């Protein structure tokens, strides 16, 4: 375990003491600093006091449920959030993602599965924050969007659009393959770092696509940038096609 990883704090919020105890023990052994909270109010207190690197939220918690905690965190931070959801409730999973969670794990779960998801999400976030060391990236203008690759920022009609690390990584993947359909499985593997074991695993992709459309498209119900490829997955419209309808044409400016 490297020194950087050992400094990372994980906040576990779950009202089941056995789950908190098991996860605290296992995650501590592999080098994380672990904080635990038995309810949503305590989770928010620890979030503001300790500034964790990643938060794991159970949906059903007293005082403030996982949805409420997720909403409050997203008002001020884009740190990774993983939801713990009930096995039979698809609504729990989708709602959490729509509120800004990056991923979910279904209860009952193997601690090893959650450990793997935590590693994957943190690795992707590391890529988001540290990939600005590349010198051959710059600013890309696509229609009404300006994408600053170095600073990992997106502007729509000159107004800053706030994206989470996962959302930016997803957008970057789509743009780098513009005009090429990408399957949900491919997107999940490239952005989240794991292969789906169940069909429902790919719903995380659908919800993040929906979130990107809501933030970037003029009319999310009739998208012009991020298109659905029937029977395949999604694709980002060919950049030259986009710029036929917008002015100025695409420019790449070195920083």
From Swiss-Prot:
Keyword terms: Chloroplast, DNA-binding, Phosphoprotein, Plastid, Transcription, Transcription regulation, Two-component regulatory system
Tell me where in this chain the PTM 4-aspartylphosphate is found.
Answer: 58
* InterPro entries hit by this protein: CheY-like_superfamily, OmpR/PhoB-type_DNA-bd, Sig_transdc_resp-reg_C-effctor, Sig_transdc_resp-reg_receiver, WalR-like, WH-like_DNA-bd_sf
UniProt organism field: Galdieria sulphuraria
Quick one: which gene encodes this?
ycf27
Please state where this protein is localized.
Plastid, Chloroplast
Q: Name one Pfam family in it.
A: Response_reg
* Superkingdom field: Eukaryota
Which residue ranges does the record assign to the Response regulatory domain? Answer: 9-122
**Name of the protein in question:** Probable transcriptional regulator ycf27
What the entry lists under SUPFAM superfamilies is as follows: C-terminal effector domain of the bipartite response regulators (SSF46894), CheY-like (SSF52172)
**DNA-binding region spans which residues?**
78-96, 137-238
Q: What lineage, starting at the top, does this entry show?
A: Eukaryota, Rhodophyta, Bangiophyceae, Galdieriales, Galdieriaceae
Range of residues in the leader sequence: none
> Per the record, GO CC terms?
chloroplast; cytosol; protein-DNA complex
**A GO molecular-function annotation:** phosphorelay response regulator activity
What biological-process terms (Gene Ontology) are attached? regulation of DNA-templated transcription
Q: What is its main location?
A: plastid
Misc: Although originally identified as Cyanidium caldarium, these sequences derive from Galdieria sulphuraria.
Q: Relate the protein's function as given in its record.
A: Probable promoter-specific protein mediating the interaction between DNA and RNA polymerase.
Against SMART domains, the record matches this protein to: REC, Trans_reg_C
